[in-house]
């Protein structure tokens, strides 16, 4: 992970602590909370270093950059997409193209959470040629890194964006149209499968269904129970 990106994550963690103070939440002593953020940030940094210049599958031959993931290392919500697209491949950041703009609107306008307060990653870290679906062997080559990311962040909810994300997290084979909107579980973490934002760019009818799924997550975060 680049030094500037790491510094940004640490700054976000410090801003979060200041916000808690302003809200009058002082039940988390600074000496106990800060090490948690630092520990998770360091763990993600080490994981990125472990991936290195990955050559574990054929995508290494065609990618421009590895798209590791970004966001709050202590996020309550993690979004897991399928694979980087062209703009993500060039920037090294997840969800920065048209689908990323839509995802940002879902997070910030719909859920009313700053994008910087969630964590975003993909099932595979490299762009498949011509944005094709990731192959089973490519997902297999990447899966241990996704497992470690989720184990480090330990969110309350994972929102699975698209078929490949939902099928991997839930270990199911049904299409996303059947998996979406139903709570599942991954290693004790609640999972809400829904459509990938890219799907909504050419299928506007799916926006209403996606919003129904997101509202279930919002209600759970508010009440702490599944509706």
Task: Indicate residue ranges for each PLM-predicted region.
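Short, small/acidic-rich helices and loops at N termini and domain boundaries
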Residues: 1-11
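A polyanion-binding, active-site-adjacent surface
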Residues: 15, 19-227
